[in-house]
Amino acid sequence: RLSVRDFRISDAAIRYEDDSTNMRFSTAPLSLRLRGNMSADRTDLDLRLTAAAMRFVSGGIPLLSDAEAELVAVIDADLANNRFTFSRNTLRLNAISVGLDGWVELDGDAVAMDLKAGCDKVQFKDVLSLIPAFYTREFKNLTAGGELSMELWARGEMRGPALPAFELKTEVRNGSFQYSSLPKAVTDINIAARVSNPGSVMDKTVVDLSKFGLRMAGNSVAATFYATNLVSDPVFRASADGRVD
């Protein structure tokens, strides 16, 4: 076991590319500081991680562009039993802060966990700042309203292809946005989405977009989407209703 009390990484650059899935991730600079008595059976790990200019592309689609992230965490580390309990933890992505609680235990090739995370009443403009299509040089001229909330939990064991039970729920309420150069705003943005798995293989994952609606220049659009059996025999249901003049 390492006799380390203070470990640091400063101004690192990380780049990951997977040509088979057209996935790209990069960030620079990245800094990490980890404090704790790593030679003890049990210790508090004080972790601070910052990353700037984060870029993430999946399937050729830009999902993050020049985002900033910060993780501040105090972890109760039971090093003798490889069990780590999270408390007083905050992950920030741009202006969005997410709290994290729970524990993770490493057991051979398995990872057991009981985790939950969430954020409440995040400003809709802060969410738009994460989307490359919105976060351009014109972003400062964007006015936006509305709120987003998110809840995530994962419980069980991850081993090989087996996943723990998990659920991610997110909701956008009364969202709106408008660029100063455009005559009309997009209003009444209301979204309710859920991704869940009962604790099995990826094939059992359910994607349920039960509500998607907005109004633009007097035209309204509403849609729903449902998918499951994504690997073996995909099942999809979708609906759309709208008027565009």
Language-model regions, residue ranges each:
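Elongated, acidic membrane-bridging lipid-handling scaffolds
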Residues: 1-83, 193
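Solvent-exposed loop/turn tips at the surfaces of repeat/solenoid architectures
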Residues: 7-14, 28-30, 52-54, 89, ...
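Flexible, solvent-exposed coil segments and beta strand-coil junctions
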Residues: 10-12, 52-54, 79-83, 127-135, ...
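Amphipathic hydrophobic-ligand
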Residues: 20-35, 61-73, 90-101, 129-155, ...
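Transmembrane beta-strands of outer-membrane beta-barrel proteins
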Residues: 45-47, 113-115, 166-168, 207, ...
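Transmembrane beta-strands of outer-membrane beta-barrel pores
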Residues: 51-55, 106, 119-123, 172-176, ...
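Transmembrane beta-strand segments that form the barrel wall of outer-membrane beta-barrel proteins
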Residues: 83-90, 206-212
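Short loop/turn motifs that connect adjacent beta-strands in outer-membrane beta-barrel proteins
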Residues: 160-164, 201-204
